[in-house]
């Protein structure tokens, strides 16, 4: 069969979401709007945290890092928009591997940061008298740096595994960006090792932080339920509300598509999950964290006021 003959593939075709011209125009406007909202929202949060000294705390340090990661996540959108404007669907082989590398790295970073933020909430709620002594700046910096190192190592491993594969004449990717699973489907090589590594990564890099996060919230729940007053319990839970909403949004998006082997994947389900993961989630996170947080809203007002009066 022709598929069994490896050829030198220099580029791939990203089919995107729709081939209908009218739908493409609507999707272009949608993605452009979401991208601008993501960049603006996350930049405002980063600026607000850096300007307002009251927000120079571990919780907001982790939040500013997550906003940075979310902004980086949305960089897959400009490629889609550029392809629409240029009337092309191509992406180079090296560009595809690079895109896959950054998506894997940033997804892992989001996962690690959510676990780190859960630990921060655990210390704040369950060990309030020791919070300042435990959550020192050096520890916070170490947790974030360690997360970047592990995420980078895992993404690099993924990329090297994909780079060693051979690809056939069929270079069409039914996706909005280069992801591991659709690339495995196109490969003419034996993908068993890559599939095993992906499942191992899912177990170690995804489930382990999730279990740490789950343990933190189990402790938080036990402590909060022992608070005698309803008002006290609500106040304690409210400190975790925004983070818990982001956790549910994140894991609700990634659990389904990334825990199946390549043979059981549906392109439509993968694309829908990818849109939620790389477009919807990054724009929702700043909204979730700012709508119910008086400190963030106050800092955002300060940022807007400073920028407005500086222009005047």
UniProtKB/Swiss-Prot annotation:
Residues 1-25, 79-99, 158-195, 259-271 are extracellular. The chain crosses the membrane at residues 26-49, 58-78, 100-119, 139-157, 196-218, 236-258, 272-291. GO terms for molecular function: G protein-coupled receptor activity; olfactory receptor activity. One of its GO terms (biological process) is signal transduction. Keywords: Cell membrane, Disulfide bond, G-protein coupled receptor, Membrane, Olfaction, Receptor, Sensory transduction, Transducer, Transmembrane, Transmembrane helix. Odorant receptor. This is Putative olfactory receptor 1F2. The gene is OR1F2P.
């Amino acid at each position: 069969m022709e598929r069994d003959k490896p050829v030198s593939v220099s580029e791939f075709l990203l089919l995107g979401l729709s081939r209908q011209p009218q739908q493409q125009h609507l999707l272009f406007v949608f993605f452009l709007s979401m991208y601008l909202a993501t960049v603006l929202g996350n930049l405002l949060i980063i600026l607000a945290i850096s300007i307002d000294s009251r927000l120079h705390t571990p919780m907001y340090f982790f939040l500013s890092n997550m906003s940075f990661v979310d902004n980086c996540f949305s960089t897959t959108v400009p490629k889609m928009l550029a392809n629409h404007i240029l009337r092309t669907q191509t992406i180079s082989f090296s560009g595809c591997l690079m895109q896959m590398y950054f998506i894997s790295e940033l997804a892992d970073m989001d996962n690690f940061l959510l676990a780190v933020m859960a630990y921060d909430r655990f210390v704040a709620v369950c060990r309030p008298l020791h919070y300042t002594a435990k959550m020192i700046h050096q520890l916070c910096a170490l947790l974030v740096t360690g997360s970047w190192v592990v995420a980078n190592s895992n993404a690099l491993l993924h990329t090297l595994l994909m780079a060693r594969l051979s690809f056939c004449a069929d270079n069409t990717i039914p996706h909005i960006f280069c992801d591991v699973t659709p690339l495995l489907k196109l490969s003419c090589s034996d993908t068993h090792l890559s599939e095993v590594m992906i499942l191992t990564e899912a177990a170690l890099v995804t489930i382990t932080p999730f279990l740490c996060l789950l343990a933190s919230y189990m402790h938080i729940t036990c402590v909060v339920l022992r608070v005698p007053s309803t008002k006290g319990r609500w106040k304690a839970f409210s400190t975790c509300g925004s983070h818990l909403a982001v956790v549910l949004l994140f894991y609700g998006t990634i659990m389904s598509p990334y825990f199946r082997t390549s043979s059981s994947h549906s392109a439509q389900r993968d694309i829908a999950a990818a849109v939620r993961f790389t477009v919807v989630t990054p724009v929702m996170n700043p909204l979730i964290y700012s709508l119910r947080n008086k400190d963030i809203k106050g800092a955002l007002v300060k940022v807007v006021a400073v920028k407005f009066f500086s222009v005047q």
